[in-house]
């Protein structure tokens, strides 16, 4: 996120998407990993031709003819691995669906190329329409090795996919061709990132930025305690001339979590708090919707993505403007675990926001929760690290040198995102509401690389206290785990720590390799830059280790994916909303948790207005004939589905594990 992570689990952040068996946390040379308990690994398996995969714990494996079928513990959700003799990807996928389900593939929504990775080349990803009224994720990946095809089919209930992301990661990244040997940097020394290598990085960045239509990108690279590059590419706002640079402020979204847990680590070192302090002890009155979970919940459980609490964003996204910090605890009081403590990686935002506010309350109990958090972050993090430009104040940030948020409209053009959308983050700011820049975040990455020492050599935090946050709390995939607001990936044989961030129209990532003294911060002002959260660190590894060239393939596949996605949206959606669809809408709807939705019409345009923001909507006919509405720019990740109930007309909004019904109101 997980991405983080980070705010939308359907497109997980950076290397959180790595999949595979989670080996014992003691694997690899990192001493800090050796001290942690190892999450359970899965069971190795093979297809008939010897392509390897790992079956996650509690999943079952069966054969349906030529298909190896893996079933999730909940039942009704499957992954199928099918070898196929075919001339192309589409034929291979058709054969695979027949072998798995005895029928042709479902109606196709989109087909896009896949980047070459893990020994597979020339792959394609097929995305399908789910049946009416059945929230499912249906897709097929046609992968090729040695001229032969193998297909992975995902046939998953949306709720299962939401809570089993780490298991899906485990299956996916462990799935490699027979005889494939994974690339490893273990025991290797990184090369100096000299002027020639930096020039190659800059060329890659500018070419990629243009290919992906990212208006502005800022980056900083550090090696062995020295900043070897800092700068910007492009502009702060599409169509304008003001450039971005290393001082430009971006909304860093979930990267804020890592800064929040640094503040908590400082409080632990001061003796004000323990990671195992019960939350209800630190903040009397704290409660979840489940009494047993409330009693078990410790400070670390709020920031480990390991407490079984599901993704839940819409409560605060649809809240009134300028909602107080206390809204976080109102949301948590409605939440209950959907998996046991420590059983499943579930990346979610309200608990992490609560962690920051609890820390602020412990430090400054006399202040309002939000003010206390802001003060704790200023005194424990921003001031000591000299992060002078980093702020939670949107008004202060959005003056002068800052990057405007951009998305893609239904017409396929880059467009500004309404800033009111991202301002909703202020109420839950410990989980994702900081504005920062390359220079300030390099100071933070330097602290992590220096084991808790500031750039002038002074001790900020004992190394053990700093690295407590690095220790595994829950498996996220192959040799990968989530700690306390930080991800770690050991798949390359050397630890890579990171966290990503994503909000409407903003993307960010910070990554460091502690064994090699290398770190990078990359910030972007467009949703179209997703792949660069992964591809930029990959490019650095190619330059530092002469690694296999994959970064360019990643960007090329992502650019093709973006073009196909835009074309599909133009084809499927009518913007503004089609007249007949709009005419069937009620003037006003209400949901008891998300509040009021008003339908406004002006000059042929239809807008949905909520408590703090509004958006123009497009419409289409979905599966089974239901009319669906979506924001024309920066929509919630799932459409509003029109329907009827005994109470009148309805609009239903579903995320992975939650359903919200807006009902016609007088």
State what each model feature region is.
Residues 193-252, 272-274, 281-282, 288, ...:
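Short, conserved catalytic-motif segment at the N-terminal edge
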Residues 15-29:
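Bacterial N-terminal signal peptides
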Residues 105, 173-201, 523-593, 647-666:
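Short, gly/Ser/Thr-rich active-site loops of penicillin-recognizing serine hydrolases
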Residues 82-85, 90-118, 593-639:
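Central antiparallel beta-sheet cores of small beta-barrel/beta-sandwich binding domains
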Residues 35, 39, 60-159:
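Conserved polar/disulfide-associated segments of primarily extracytoplasmic proteins
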Residues 226, 230-237, 290-504, 508-512:
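Short, surface-exposed loop or secondary-structure junction motifs
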Residues 79-82, 146-159, 509-512, 516-526, ...:
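Short, well-ordered beta-strand elements
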Residues 66-71, 571-610, 643:
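Short, solvent-exposed loop/hinge segments that bridge or flank secondary-structure elements
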């Amino acid at each position: 996120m997980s991405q983080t992570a980070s705010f939308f689990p359907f497109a997980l952040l950076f290397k959180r998407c790595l999949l595979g068996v989670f080996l014992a946390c003691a694997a690899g040379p990192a001493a800090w990993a050796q001290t942690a308990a190892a999450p359970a690994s899965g069971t190795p398996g093979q297809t008939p031709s010897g392509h390897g995969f790992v079956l996650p714990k509690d999943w079952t494996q069966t054969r349906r003819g030529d298909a190896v079928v893996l079933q999730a513990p909940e039942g009704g959700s499957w992954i199928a691995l099918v070898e196929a003799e075919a001339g192309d990807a589409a034929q291979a996928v058709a054969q695979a669906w027949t072998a798995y389900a005895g029928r042709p593939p479902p109606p196709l929504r989109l087909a896009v190329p896949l980047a070459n990775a893990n020994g597979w080349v020339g792959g394609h990803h097929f995305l399908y329409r789910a049946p009416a009224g059945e929230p499912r994720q249906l897709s097929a990946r046609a992968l090729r090795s040695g001229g032969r095809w193998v297909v992975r089919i995902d046939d998953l209930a949306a709720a299962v996919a939401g809570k089993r992301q780490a298991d899906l990661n485990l299956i996916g990244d462990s799935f490699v061709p027979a005889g494939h040997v994974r690339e490893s940097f273990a025991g290797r020394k990184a090369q100096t990132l000299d002027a020639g290598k930096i020039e190659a990085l800059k060329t890659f960045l500018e070419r990629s930025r243009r290919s992906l239509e990212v208006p502005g990108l800022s980056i900083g690279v550090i090696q062995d305690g020295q900043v070897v590059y800092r700068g910007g590419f492009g502009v702060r706002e599409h169509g304008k001339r003001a450039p971005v640079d290393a001082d430009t402020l971006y909304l860093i979204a979930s990267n804020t979590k890592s800064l929040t847990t640094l503040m908590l680590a400082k409080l632990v070192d001061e003796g004000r708090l323990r990671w195992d302090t019960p939350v209800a002890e630190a903040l009397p009155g704290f409660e979840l919707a489940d009494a047993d979970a409330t009693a078990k919940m410790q400070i670390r459980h709020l920031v480990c993505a390991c407490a079984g609490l599901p993704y839940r964003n819409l409560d605060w996204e649809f809240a009134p403007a300028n909602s107080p910090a206390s809204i976080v605890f109102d949301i948590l009081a409605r939440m209950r675990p959907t998996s046991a403590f420590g059983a499943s990686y579930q990346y979610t935002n309200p608990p992490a926001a609560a962690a920051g506010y609890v820390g602020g309350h412990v430090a400054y109990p006399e202040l309002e929760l939000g003010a206390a958090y802001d003060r704790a972050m200023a005194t424990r993090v921003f001031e000591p690290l000299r992060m002078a430009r980093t702020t939670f104040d949107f008004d202060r940030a959005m003056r002068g040198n800052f990057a405007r948020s951009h998305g893609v409209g239904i017409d396929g053009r880059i467009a500004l995102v309404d800033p009111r959308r991202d301002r909703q983050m202020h109420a839950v700011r410990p989980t994702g509401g900081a504005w920062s820049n390359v220079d300030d975040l390099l100071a933070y990455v330097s602290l992590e690389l220096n084991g808790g020492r500031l750039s002038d050599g002074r001790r900020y935090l004992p190394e053990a206290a700093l690295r407590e946050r690095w220790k595994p709390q829950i498996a996220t995939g192959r040799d990968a785990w989530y700690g306390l607001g930080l991800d770690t990936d050991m798949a390359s044989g050397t630890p890579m720590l990171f966290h990503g961030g994503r909000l409407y129209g903003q993307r960010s990532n910070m990554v460091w390799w502690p064994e090699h003294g290398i770190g990078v911060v990359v910030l972007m002002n467009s949703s179209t830059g997703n792949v660069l959260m992964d591809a930029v660190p990959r490019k650095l590894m190619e330059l530092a280790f002469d690694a296999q060239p994959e970064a360019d393939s990643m960007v090329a596949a992502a650019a093709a994916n973006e073009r196909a996605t835009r074309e599909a949206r133009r084809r499927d959606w009518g913007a503004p909303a089609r007249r007949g669809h709009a005419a069937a809408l009620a003037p006003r709807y209400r949901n008891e948790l998300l509040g009021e939705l008003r339908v406004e019409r002006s000059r042929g345009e239809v807008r949905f207005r909520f408590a703090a923001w509004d958006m123009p909507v497009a419409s289409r006919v979905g599966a089974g004939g239901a009319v669906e509405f979506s924001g024309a720019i920066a929509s919630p990740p799932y459409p509003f589905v029109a329907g009827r109930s005994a109470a009148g007309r309805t609009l239903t909004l579903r995320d992975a594990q939650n359903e919200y019904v807006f009902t016609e109101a007088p």
